[in-house]
Amino acid sequence: MKLGMVGLPNVGKSTLFNALTNAGAESANYPFCTIEKNIGIVSVPDERLDKLAQMYDPDKFTPATLEFVDIAGLVKGASKGEGLGNKFLADIREVDAIVHVVRCFEDDNIVHVDGNINPLRDIETINLELIFSDIEMIDRRIDRAKKAAKGDKKFLSEIDFLEKLKTHLEAGKSARGYDFTEDERELIKSTPLLSAKPVIYAANLSESDFAGNIENNENFCKVRQLADEENSAVLPICAQTEAEIAEMDDEDKAMFLAELGLEVSGLNRIIKEGYSLLGLISFLTAGKPEVRAWTIKKGTKAPQAAGKIHTDFEKGFIRAEVIAFNDLMDCGSMAAAKEKGLVRLEGKEYVMNDGDIVLFRFNV
């Protein structure tokens, strides 16, 4: 699963990406320093894995991962190919969700592409480019449906829906805010709309604002209100602080976060929020050879989860031995959990839960 990091030039996007992935993307005080998209794989923080590692002392420790893509800075006119517009839109098309870095800090030494700080305008700039691109796609879809309707009247209802969606988009509203019926959702699946992708707004604050009372930052409050209105997530972060934290060892990091009154870094909150935003959960496998988290979509059944480990596991699935993470921790060992009857046998229709510890039985 991929999350694309977007933002106008000089909002702190690449600084945040560098901290997130330690990938070292060039970060400079001028537009388009990120011309080629940079890709980084990050581990999903999961304290359950750490506790399983203490229990099993495994030879190998493998957390779940997410892919983050630092996408080139965008300016107005992207949907018409201006700046790096065509590349920006093509890169957005490839990701599953968007982390939109929004500048909420004042700094005369860092230029803003529009000359002053206005996060709502910045958000609108990017959202409108995605919306304009979607309108073009909808127009082409309407043209095809109208031609098809000459021979098959069933396309008339599709045209009616597409016209309504186009009107919604032309009002400057993203597809995320459109109230799709189940049938409409099926219809639009073949036309991946950019403005329908889920969003996390990362509100980039100054170090002083981030360390103080965030509520005093009017820019952050405006972004939060907008996020609430469109059912998106918003996280206050300080890219500069995150860059410093990323260079610290675990002990110094814990002390620094405690001084800020935080339990986890902003980066970890972005990663966890991204995991949740994509509708992902983890099931766990544990033993001496390896303790590992496996990523699946919510609602995945046991055989399909087994297939994440190996296709043979899914083809020859017999049953799954399952215990909830908390039950195992309460018992202290798998042997004690089995004695108490807490290890369940589940069949092909079992829907996996987040934190299930599983041993799959199969035969091929």
Residue positions per predicted region:
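Conserved G1/Walker A P-loop phosphate-binding module
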Residues: 1-111, 139-140, 144
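C-terminal-of-GTPase-core extension/linker across diverse P-loop GTPases
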Residues: 2-6, 17, 144-351, 358, ...
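Short capping/connector residues at structural and topological boundaries
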Residues: 6, 32, 37-40, 47-49, ...
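Phosphate-binding glycine-rich loops and adjacent basic patches that engage nucleotide phosphates
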Residues: 12-17, 45-57, 85-109, 121-130, ...
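Amphipathic alpha-helical transducer elements in NTP-driven molecular machines
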Residues: 32, 46-49, 62-68, 82-96, ...
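Conserved Switch II/interswitch segment of TRAFAC-class P-loop GTPases
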Residues: 40-45, 72-82, 93-155, 168-181, ...
